A protein has these predicted regions:
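GH16 jelly-roll
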Residues: 91, 100-373
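Extracellular carbohydrate recognition and processing domains
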Residues: 27-61, 77, 240
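Beta-strand signatures of extracellular beta-sandwich domains
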Residues: 17-21, 81, 88, 295-297
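Extended, low-complexity, turn-rich repeat/linker tracts enriched in Gly/Pro/Ser/Thr and Asp/Glu
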Residues: 9-17, 26-27, 58, 74-76, ...
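Extra-cytoplasmic beta-strand recognition segments
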Residues: 1-19, 48-56, 86-88, 194, ...
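Extracellular beta-strand ligand-recognition surfaces/modules
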Residues: 49-88, 217-222, 336-349
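Trp-centered recognition loops
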Residues: 3, 9, 43-51, 61, ...
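Beta-strand acidic-aromatic groove motif in beta-rich domains, primarily in extracellular
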Residues: 13-25, 62-67, 213-221, 249-251
Length: 373
């Protein structure tokens, strides 16, 4: 209605309309839908109710804005003296029910095919056990590798025990667990050193990440030969890093530095359909790598591109050498924002269900070479 303090109401006949605009923040808040309804009269005394109907895709249109108001089409007059009350947005469909938590579910997705790349190696974890001709376990707190706390003051001890790492149903499961009797976290860390190396091409990994305070899952690569010396001189390539319950974010990084630790990194925010913890459908992180630079791609969308020429003091360039892959889920350390909460972790030697949202799950690792013709 119009405030009673204003002299005039809107009376028939009138070109006045009530309207709703749908705005897309990803396109400069441009109007993607305009819905209006004739409002021939607006009283100074009585409220009038006007209903307008639109459809909203809760996934594709998440974050869209709505504007509502009144406009006299004939004069483009948009008076400030119109009062609104009791604005109600009603959903026509019930939200999708939250799926029941799963245990050791594997989607068994197949690696993608690309017109400009040829698949040259893959591990779909289709056997009953880990292929130890490719993958080897790393153990302990890092001391035997010269990096106590794994260089990051991490809390966990790595094992090769079936409690922490196993292959079943076509997926690899890495499970950080808490031992109540020892007040100690255990997890697993695998690497393909001396088993499978990578040098240029495209690398795809199908995965789902855990979501607990203090967890630090990673899919990454280290140099096969340390040609230019220890870390970071010979480089490090992080395809994916997550932390805590921040499943709506993904971090991708290239580390290097002949003089001191340098890195080029990008945090990317994700919409719900791309959250990193998705035990039912999984996600695909890809690294496209050549002698010019890197591109990180997530679920088919480019996240981040870097050219070597833009990296200061890179030469001699370690990213022209061979690398191997690491898969692990750390607990605590410098990276997570929160201290680990034991109540959120699966328990060691416990018969209670350990849910897939508490595990780093790898569906496959696929390596492609770019076609030359």
């Amino acid at each position: 209605k119009r405030p009673e303090s204003l002299q005039y109401s809107v009376a028939a006949p009138s070109n006045a309309k009530a309207f709703i605009k749908k705005l897309d923040p990803n396109a400069g808040f441009s109007t993607v839908e305009y819905i209006s309804k004739d409002v021939t009269e607006i009283s100074r005394n009585d409220w009038s109710r006007h209903e307008l109907t639109t459809e909203v895709d809760s996934v594709a249109e998440q974050g869209f804005y709505f504007q509502f108001g009144y406009n006299n089409v004939a004069t483009s007059y948009n008076p400030s003296g119109v009062l609104y009350d009791n604005v109600v947005i009603e959903g026509g469909l019930a939200p999708e029910p939250t799926p029941a938590p799963t245990v050791d579910f594997c989607p068994n997705n197949s690696p993608n095919e690309y017109d400009d790349y040829t698949l040259t190696w893959e591990d779909q974890f289709s056997e009953d056990s880990l292929d130890t001709s490719v993958w080897s376990y790393m153990y302990g707190d890092g001391s035997q590798y010269g990096i106590p706390g794994w260089g990051n003051s991490e809390w966990q001890l790595y094992t090769g025990d079936a409690e922490n790492v196993y292959v079943v149903n076509g997926c690899l499961y890495i499970v950080p667990k808490y031992s109540q009797s020892e007040d100690q976290y255990y997890s697993a860390r695998l690497r393909s050193k001396d088993g499978q190396t990578f040098q240029f091409g495209r690398i795809d990994v199908g995965f789902s990440a855990p979501a607990m305070d203090g967890v630090w899952p990673a899919i990454w690569m280290m140099p096969e030969d340390d040609r230019y010396g220890g870390w970071p001189r010979s480089g490090e390539i992080d395809l994916f890093e997550g932390k805590d319950k921040l499943i709506d974010q993904i971090n991708t990084t290239a580390h290097y530095g002949h003089d001191f630790h340098r890195y080029y990194s990008r945090w990317t925010s994700l919409t719900p359909q791309d959250y990193t913890s998705d035990p039912i459908n999984h996600n695909v992180i890809s690294l496209i790598w050549d002698d010019v630079g890197f591109e990180w791609v997530y679920n088919g969308v480019s996240l981040f591109t870097v050219e070597y020429a833009s990296l200061p003091n890179l030469e001699p360039n370690p990213f022209l050498e061979r690398f191997h892959m690491l898969l692990n889920s750390a607990v605590g350390g410098h990276y997570p924002a929160y201290a680990p909460n034991p109540d959120q972790y699966c328990k060691l030697n416990d018969t209670a269900a350990c849910y897939d949202s508490q595990k780093l799950i790898i569906d496959y690792v696929a390596y492609y070479q770019k076609n030359t013709n």
